[in-house]
């Protein structure tokens, strides 16, 4: 980064020092942080002098505060240029002072909040600790946390939805073009095999952009190595599609057009639910998507604090890509000692979280989502590829868990399917699921469900 003067450099240093006093230390405070500007047509990569995050992995979801330098561009245009970081607050460092901004989804909703002279930086940061500290900013960004009128003056709740719309629209367009082009060049293409190939390449690109070894050193020319490493990483077989033309087409599009730096875990969930699951599969499984805002809302209202740390065991039946498991992991992380060793924290998450899902492809997606949520750990997740209504291990797992989170299938058991299931009390899947859970959930167990009204 380039400073106009030693005075501006000193003010910048003072801002970072006081961000550290608010808890933004080590990995939570990044200098020269690069992120993709999804608001712009060509998705340029921007680099910001400093960015403060509430937790790792770094993403627009966990971004809290942007620190920018007033060098050439300044004021509102500078703030809006960096809004794709996802931070609701920004500090603009000039040669004279620090300007505190609310970052909005556009020029109109971004506005100056406060001017801070250099000799007042420490005092002002301490006075605003309750608004600027990481836990408070994270809560303010979350749906389900009620903001008062004064807080709404400082936070633009439209920023993240606007950013997510841009990201999802562009990702969906790019991937649908990839699918269409691959289908045109390979007339007898099996779509499920193509979807698996696309997701493996996406996984490789995510790991590359997150600088995970050995993916960080790969390029689009290392197609075979990338697929082999992804398969090894997840303990899965390679995709069925191996012809050079199809593989090269998909690699070229994804590697050149997509950049997963600063993207949230929920982006992969969106890709899976909206692009890589065909309507027939969705209909056969009776599945329906769970918006991540709903999952977070449900998890936010589960009183985990009432349980001992070792008793916060969670099961997500019909977990799909693990939307509730990811939300629960993020909530459990907030309740843990922030000084806990990363390896021990991962082992704790693995002990606490359990998922059941019939669709093996969905489990593969869930593994990647959980890995990104607990970045960069990837081993040991307890995701069982079984039908909840026929699984010999489901009831014992329910008995061992104190929290059930789920969005069960809304469909009925068909006349053809009913003989396959023993002891059905209801032909409605939501009702049957609820019966089984209530029969075996431990006393004082907790439920967080998304259910149809007429189940």
Task: Identify the function of each model-found stretch.
Residues 1-2, 298:
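Intrinsically disordered, charged low-complexity linkers and terminal tails
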Residues 273-455:
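SAM-dependent methyltransferase catalytic region
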Residues 57-61, 83-86, 209, 306, ...:
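Short, solvent-exposed loop/edge-beta patches enriched in aromatic
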Residues 174, 178-189, 205, 209, ...:
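Short secondary-structure junctions and interdomain/linker hinges
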Residues 2-204, 249-269:
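Short, basic/polar, glycine-containing "phosphate-handling" surface segments that engage DNA
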Residues 188-192, 207-218, 284, 307-311:
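Short, solvent-exposed secondary-structure capping/transition elements
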Residues 211-278:
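Long recognition/docking surfaces used for binding and targeting
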Residues 200, 204-214, 219-220, 225, ...:
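Coupling/switch/interface segments within P-loop NTPase motor domains and analogous charged loops
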């Amino acid at each position: 980064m380039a400073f106009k003067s030693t005075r501006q450099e000193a003010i910048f240093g003072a801002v970072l020092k006081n961000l550290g006093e608010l808890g933004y230390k080590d990995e939570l405070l990044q200098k020269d942080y690069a992120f993709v500007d999804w608001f712009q047509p060509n998705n340029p990569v921007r680099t910001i002098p400093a960015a403060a995050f509430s937790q790792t992995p770094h993403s627009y979801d966990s971004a809290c505060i942007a620190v920018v330098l007033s060098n050439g561009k300044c004021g509102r245009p500078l703030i809006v240029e960096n809004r794709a970081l996802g931070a609701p607050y920004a500090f603009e460092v000039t040669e004279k002072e620090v300007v505190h901004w609310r970052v909005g989804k556009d020029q109109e909703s971004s506005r100056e909040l406060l001017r801070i002279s250099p000799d007042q930086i420490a005092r002002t940061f301490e006075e605003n600790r309750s608004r600027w500290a990481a836990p408070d900013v994270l809560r303010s960004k979350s749906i389900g946390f009620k903001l008062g009128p004064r807080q709404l003056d400082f936070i633009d709740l439209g920023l993240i939805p606007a950013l997510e719309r841009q990201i999802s629209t562009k990702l969906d367009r790019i991937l649908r073009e990839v699918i269409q082009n691959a289908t045109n060049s390979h007339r007898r293409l099996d779509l499920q095999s193509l979807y698996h190939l696309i997701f493996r390449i996406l996984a490789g690109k995510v790991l590359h952009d997150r600088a995970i070894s050995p993916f960080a050193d790969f390029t689009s020319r290392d197609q075979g190595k990338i697929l082999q490493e992804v398969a090894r990483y997840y303990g899965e077989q390679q995709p069925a599609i191996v012809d050079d033309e199809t593989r090269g087409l998909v690699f070229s599009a994804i590697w050149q057009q997509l950049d997963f730096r600063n993207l949230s875990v929920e982006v992969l969930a969106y890709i899976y639910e909206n692009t890589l699951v065909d309507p027939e599969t969705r209909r056969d499984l009776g599945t329906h998507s769970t918006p991540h805002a709903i999952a977070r809302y449900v998890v936010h209202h589960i009183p985990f604090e009432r349980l001992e740390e070792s008793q916060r065991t969670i099961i997500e039946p019909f977990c799909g890509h693990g939307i509730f498991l990811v939300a629960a992991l993020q909530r459990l992380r907030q309740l843990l000692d922030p000084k806990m060793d990363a390896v021990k924290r991962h082992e704790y998450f693995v002990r606490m979280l359990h998922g059941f899902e019939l669709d093996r492809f969905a489990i593969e997606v869930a593994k990647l989502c959980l890995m990104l949520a607990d970045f960069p750990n990837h081993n040991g997740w307890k995701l069982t590829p079984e039908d909840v209504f026929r699984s010999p291990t489901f009831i014992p797992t329910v008995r061992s868990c104190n929290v059930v989170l789920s969005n069960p299938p809304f469909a009925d058991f068909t006349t053809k399917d009913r003989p396959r299931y023993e002891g059905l009390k209801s032909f409605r899947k939501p009702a049957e699921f609820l019966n089984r859970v209530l029969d075996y959930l431990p006393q004082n167990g907790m439920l967080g469900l998304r259910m149809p009204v007429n189940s």
